[in-house]
């Protein structure tokens, strides 16, 4: 059975790059009728926070990427937080030491750093070996460690050989002998390093495919060596391309919003974000761009992942969001849009009126947060607009003639035409002025939609105010 995992660190909000990784894993698991596992990599105790773990889960749920096993739902391969698995890592490290594939190091971190700096100053790569650390392994040092309650670090003996990775996306990647030296797998604080914890977890959780960003490609050499040491076949690796900003540089905060939470707060829809992220580094066999989650699952395959960097285009995401927003049932749209109106200080009293406003304005809106300003004039009188002198009589007469008219465009339009003809006013100039009087804006939805919905009382009141009444 296919088993994949998404393994974020709870050190901040879910970045769109992480969300895309989670999405690709989720789609592959669902397509192959496999399992999608959520694992929390929280061994960086200083930066990891349970609050961020909750936020990460909240963002994944909002996107609709639900996991089969994880810290909150459990499963047969737990615990699913690395901080709760420390004893497991220790046992596996000790096993490697017993088998002569790893060794204890009694050097203090600052001594290791000194060695590193010395190697660099001599123009050598900072590669470590067991011989370099032997001088620190003395009875005195061991006693010191014991008295201080410290554990020796554990270093892995890196075999001197080439390693070949057949990556689903990158193709054949060869790691040459001597690319790295021995490396730490358990620190003296008793916690595992990223690569070691990752391999132990993937082995024990029976992960079959590792789909992740290509910034992890450099970690793969260490991981392949560890799988070999444990005499386990590595999973299938698929390193997906980096997401770049419009300027071709790695996507970061300087490009604007980059977290799922920020996009949600701006009024983006999960359907749109999922659809857009899926197309960053993957393409539909028929080139389709607008795809539901179900369509993404049925058409997803790893062989359509591109090795080329993907460009994050905020305008395309916005366009796509507009499409989903306009095609949403009006009840759901009203439910999602309402908090944005409340935040803008607009109180919704009449639900049916609110839905009609959304129907009229949605063609001009691409994200939920744009609705309040686009439709504020339906709920509040705009500032009075001065009517040009040559049109004041037109508006005065209209105000009188429309008092007793039934409030439909079929009844209103003939009155407009009659009054304009009497005064010899060009329709274009009149309608532009009328729009400003009613909405306080130069552009917006069609007046034929605005006028009936505003109602006679508001229509006449706004003309009265602009005439100085």
Swiss-Prot record:
It catalyses: tRNA(Glu) + L-glutamate + ATP = L-glutamyl-tRNA(Glu) + AMP + diphosphate. ATP binds at residue 253. It is found in: Cytoplasm. Its EC number is 6.1.1.17. One of its GO terms (biological process) is glutamyl-tRNA aminoacylation. Its main location: cytoplasm. GO terms for molecular function: ATP binding; glutamate-tRNA ligase activity; tRNA binding; zinc ion binding. Monomer. This is Glutamate--tRNA ligase 1. It comes from Thermotoga maritima (strain ATCC 43589 / DSM 3109 / JCM 10099 / NBRC 100826 / MSB8).
């Amino acid at each position: 059975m296919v088993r994949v995992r998404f393994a974020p660190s709870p050190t901040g909000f879910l970045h769109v790059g992480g969300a895309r990784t989670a999405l690709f894993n989720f789609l592959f698991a669902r397509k192959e009728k496999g399992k999608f596992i959520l694992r929390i990599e929280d061994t960086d105790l200083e930066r990891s926070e349970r609050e961020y773990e909750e936020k990460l889960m909240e963002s994944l749920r909002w996107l609709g990427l639900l996991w089969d096993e994880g810290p909150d739902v459990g499963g047969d391969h737990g615990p699913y937080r690395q901080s709760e698995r420390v004893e497991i890592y220790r046992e596996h490290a000790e096993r490697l030491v017993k088998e002569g594939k790893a060794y204890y190091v009694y050097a203090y971190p600052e001594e290791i750093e000194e060695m590193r700096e010395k190697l660099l100053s001599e123009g050598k790569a900072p590669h470590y070996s067991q011989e370099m650390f032997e001088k620190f392994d003395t009875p005195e040092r061991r006693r010191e460690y014991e008295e201080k309650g410290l554990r020796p670090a554990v270093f892995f003996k890196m075999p001197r050989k080439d390693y070949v990775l057949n990556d689903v996306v990158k193709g054949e990647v060869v790691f040459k002998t001597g690319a790295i030296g021995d490396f730490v797998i358990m620190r003296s604080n008793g916690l595992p390093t990223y690569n070691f914890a990752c391999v132990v977890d993937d082995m024990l959780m029976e992960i079959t495919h590792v789909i992740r960003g290509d910034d992890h490609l450099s970690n793969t050499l260490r991981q392949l060596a560890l799988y070999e040491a444990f005499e386990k076949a590595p999973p299938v690796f698929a390193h997906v391309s980096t997401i770049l900003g419009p300027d071709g540089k790695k996507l970061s905060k300087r490009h604007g919003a980059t977290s799922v939470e920020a996009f949600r707060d701006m009024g983006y829809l999960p359907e749109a974000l999922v659809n857009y992220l899926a197309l960053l580094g993957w393409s539909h066999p028929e080139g389709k761009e607008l795809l539901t989650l179900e369509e993404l699952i049925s058409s997803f395959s790893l062989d359509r992942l591109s090795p080329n960097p993907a460009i994050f285009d905020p305008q395309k995401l916005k366009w796509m969001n507009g499409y989903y927003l306009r095609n949403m049932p009006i009840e759901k749209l009203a439910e999602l849009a309402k908090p944005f109106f409340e935040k803008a200080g607009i109180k919704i009293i009449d639900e049916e009126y609110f839905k009609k406003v959304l129907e009229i304005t949605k063609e001009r809106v691409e994200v939920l947060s744009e609705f309040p300003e686009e439709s504020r004039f339906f709920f509040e009188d705009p500032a009075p607009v001065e009517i040009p002198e040559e049109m004041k009589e037109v508006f005065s007469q209209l105000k009188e003639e429309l008092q007793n008219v039934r409030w439909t465009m079929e009844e209103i339009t003939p009155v407009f035409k009659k009054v304009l003809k009497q005064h010899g006013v060009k329709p274009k100039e009149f309608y532009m002025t009328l729009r400003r009087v009613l909405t306080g804006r130069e552009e917006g939805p069609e007046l034929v939609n605005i006028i009936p919905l505003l109602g006679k009382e508001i229509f006449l009141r706004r003309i009265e105010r602009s005439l100085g009444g």
